């Protein structure tokens, strides 16, 4: 009976040691995704989104489909650097 008690405690301890622990890196990945979005302004003439990153202006092309083009000149747009996507029809 004594050996079974030790075995139960031993297996319980092994389960506790082997169970995964949530790390902070999961939270950091989610934070990095949020920090990778940059707001900018649309150019209706060129159908581009110009946003400021690191003190420099970056220009990306908006989509050519009707639901991806700029709505109006100087309309707010958003570039997601993590997913490499631009949204030129972002509501203000």
Swiss-Prot record:
Residues 1-18 form the signal peptide. One of its GO terms (cellular component) is host cell cytoplasm. Residues 19-34 form a propeptide. GO terms for biological process: defense response to fungus; killing of cells of another organism. It holds the Pfam family Antifungal_prot. The keyword Disulfide bond applies. Transmembrane segments: none annotated. The keyword Signal applies. InterPro entries: Antifungal-protein_dom_sf, Antifungal_prot. Keywords: Antimicrobial, Disulfide bond, Fungicide, Host cytoplasm, Secreted, Signal. It is found in: Secreted; Host cytoplasm. Its main location: secreted. Disulfide bonds join 42-70, 49-77, 62-88. Belongs to the antifungal protein pafB family. Antifungal protein that acts as an inhibitor of growth of human pathogenic molds and yeasts. This is Antifungal protein B. The gene is pafB.
